Amino acid sequence: MNKNEFLYKLINYPGQLYRRIQIKLQKSMLMECGEQVRFGRNVEISWSNCSIGDDVYIGDNAIFLCAHAPLHIGPHVMFGPNCSIITGDHRMDIIGTYMSKVTVAEKLPENDMTVVIEGDNWVGANALILKGVTIGKGAVIAAGAVVTHNVPPYSIVGGCLLK
């Protein structure tokens, strides 16, 4: 190893150590965590309401918001960068009340619904999966897709507002 390689490794060592500790903490906060689960950088998940199966990769900058309804991710799933999953919604039918003023107690059951990703799936970059969706085993979600309805097993879907 030459001097430049040594200096490069020395400079990056604190960041690598921090990253290992961060991933260990992330896994410990999950409701359930399988083997060989890997997280990209800047991943934000509602940790205590999310279960992840074996051999799952979640790409950089993913945001999984599942505060009031759970998210279940099966085994062998890959998420590209910038994917989002949101298991909740805001109530918009209370006339004269700002959405930010509606309390959790005022939410309806249909405002928060479980998302299930059955396993053996590939979710492309910038995909958005919304509340109440089940993605069947082996299904592929194209980059940039907005998924609002269930996806059958072993299908390939893309585009906005999938039906």
Where are these regions (language model features)?
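Extended, small-residue-rich solenoid/repeat segments and analogous flexible loops
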Residues: 1-45
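Context-gated lysine
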Residues: 3, 9, 24-27, 101, ...
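Low-complexity, intrinsically disordered short peptide segments enriched in small/polar/basic residues
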Residues: 8, 18, 126, 143-144
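Short, conserved clusters of charged catalytic residues that mark active-site
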Residues: 20-21, 68, 124, 142
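Short acidic capping loops at alpha-helix termini that bridge into adjacent secondary structure
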Residues: 35, 54, 75, 119, ...
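Flexible, glycine/small-residue-enriched loop-and-beta-strand segment within the central core
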Residues: 44-52, 57-131, 160-161
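C-terminal/domain-terminus segments
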Residues: 129-163
